[in-house]
Each structure stands twice: as C-alpha cells, then as structure tokens.
Amino acid sequence: MITGQGITRTFPGRGSMLRREPVRALRGVDFTIPDGGAVSFIGESGCGKTTLGRILCGYEDFDGGDLVIDGQSLKALRPKDRVPYFRRIQMIHQDPYTALNPTRTIGSILADPLNLRARQTGAAAGWVRERGAELLGLVGLDPDYVLPRYPHMLSGGMRQRVVIARALTVDPEVLVADEAVSMIDVSLRLGILQLLTDLRTKLGVSLLFITHDVATARYLGTGGELYVIYRGMVVEHGDTDTIIQHPAHPYTQCLLSAIPVLRGIEEPGPDRMIPLAPLDERSQPPGCLFEPRCPLAAADCRAAVPELAQRDGSVQEHACIHPERRSVVAVSS
C-alpha cells in the first residue's frame, strides 16, 4: 500500500528575480493507493496531477510531507536507498510516439530491463527473449511480428501496448497511467483501457490513472477511489461512482458539466454549470482557491481554506463549506 501524507511540491517561478513568485504545484495532498486497487486523479491541465505521478515514480522529489510505501517512510531514506521502492512503481507515459527510442527495435527496447533482471536472478540463456515475447502476448501483440520491428513501423495503439509491456518488465506492483489514451486514436482507446483493467485483474497490480477525462476515469475506476485535484489541492475524494453521480464540490460539478451531451439521445442534468472566469494562475485568494471562479461563492468563502472533510452527511470528503448536491450528469432521454 502507498500513502501520501501532506505531499507538497514548489517550483521556482518565472519572471525577474525581484518579482518571481514560486509555483505551488502540490499543497498538502493526502492519498492512499491500496494493494490491487484502482485510483484516479482527475483535474484540468496544470492542477498538479502529473507532478504527483512523477513523485510516485521517483522522477520528482517532494519538498514537504512524506511518501510511505508498505510502511516505509521515504523521507527517512537517502535517495539511493529509495530506488528499490520506486522500481516497484512504473509509469505508462502519455505519448507513445516519443516514449520509445526510434533507433532501436522493440526487442532491444524490452531487452534492456530484462537483461538486468536476468543478471540479478541468474536466469538461463534465452530467458530474455522468451520473457519479452510473453509480455507482448500479455498486452495483445504478436511477438513474432513486433519484436524485430522499429517503433515507426507500428501504429499508435500498438506502440502504447509496447510501452505497457516495457513497464511490466520489472514486475511492478503499481502502474501509473498518465493520460495513457489521450494521444492515440479514439477508436483504439477502449482497447487500451480494457487492457489496463485486465492487467489489474490478472497480475494483481494497483492502478493509478491520471486524467482530465471523466469518462475514462469512471471506466477504469469503477469500484475504486477518485481524487479531484484543483491547483494542487484535493477538493473532493471518495468512491468513483458516488462522486460522479452525486458531486458535492462546485469544481467537480463544473468538470462534469463540461461533458458533451448527445442531442436527441441524452438530456443534460438540470444544474449544469461552468466557472465564471478562466483560471489566473498568479492569483492567490486568501480563502478557497476556487472562490474567484466559483458560481456559488459567498463572502465567507474568502475567510479560510476549507479542509477536506465529510459535511452534511455526505459519503465522500470535499473541501466546500457550501456544498450542494446537483444533477449535472447527462442522462438518457
């Protein structure tokens, strides 16, 4: 199990030295990824969800809080001692067109991590190729066709399956899928999503899905947990289906209101809404961070930052002092 405890991450700002404001990408984020569970981080671009995924994989360091993996605090470890823990968490990158070395065959791309494992375990000769072929078969590809080919010879969907196979070479316990279907053809997305669901069932791996798409989060996260992130803060957390069917925080309601409705087939929820203004990343309101854009903002929203908690008998946790249950999701007509 992986637990984030008050994770913060701040980057240097842009501009002159005298007027440079730091960028707070994450502001005290708490989360839990259970063994074999499905967790989704959802939010608009720039909310901090990818930074959180990079911290989980060891690509970025956190400057506050702690990351606990199976009871071990990573804050207490030196960077080199964290490597075995991060090896158990593998990233499935967003862009399959740049994630694979174009000068190498798929067989050699998969062989690098497998050769390392073979040396560590004393595997027999021929194991690397056999394991590479097995992993390609696991992700629905023909090994005889794919192994000798270069990335440019494969379609986008096939490349993404190779990226997934490469992540599986080290037998990870957690897969972090960062917008894993956003760069491939719409007609191929469902196949990749179903593959990730099947891998979670077959291998028992935990799945963290990072996305801005409510539909994909719901497809992968059914029966799991959903974290809604806004400007580096979790503003709503709970069961995926509960949040999508009964959103409490206005930001979650705005995200759901942005889902297109098929005219003549669906009817929009009666309370769909959009933010009042575009996001100004430089603004630092004294209270709720969503208050300048919130259609439901009141004067007391500026008093203090609301804590993430259960309010008014809600099942999920949310950070709004004036939650309203609203019907924003499209329904069949």
Q: Where do the model's predicted regions map?
A:
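ABC transporter nucleotide-binding domains
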Residues: M1-H246, S257, E324-S333
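Charged, flexible cofactor/metal-binding loops and thiol motifs
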Residues: M17, G238-S333
